[in-house]
């Protein structure tokens, strides 16, 4: 799918979420889903009911405090970027941070936009040039955006 996206001139927007970068996170998440389903069944709860939802939310908070997720590291995010860059080339990769709605599942050093200098420093340390980093930060997305606007104007 990523190769097809690149072949068609698109850009994949890479997220920092442990869902995509950390095998351990995915394992923990799968285990949690089973425990949560069991909690709901044993307590005869319905996620659609507000009263039950508050009980489920309280369970989730307690569970996450007891068993915090391994959300990964900056290094794992950089490995994630490099894997895709090596797969399709830097011209087809961008930043799709996915900050909205993912609280608690991002690496400590990449929690919000103010953390971008950490990502940039990591890319520089791995030998990426400023020009390549500009492509990742916005250049590739803006290239595709321009192509979309040109297509829309001509049709």
Where are these regions (language model features)?
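Active/binding-pocket-proximal capping segment
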Residues: 29, 99-101, 112, 141
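Aromatic-lined glycan-binding groove of carbohydrate-active enzymes
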Residues: 1-59
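Outer-membrane beta-barrel pore domains
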Residues: 62-75, 101-110, 123-132
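Short acidic/histidine-rich active-site segments
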Residues: 13-19, 88-110
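Intrinsically disordered, low-complexity acidic Ser/Thr-rich regulatory segments
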Residues: 51-79, 83
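Short, solvent-exposed loop/turn and secondary-structure capping segments
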Residues: 15, 23-25, 106, 146-149
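Histidine/acidic residue-rich metal-binding segments in metalloenzymes
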Residues: 1-10, 76-91
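Mid-to-C-terminal alpha-helical segments outside catalytic/metal-binding sites
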Residues: 111-155
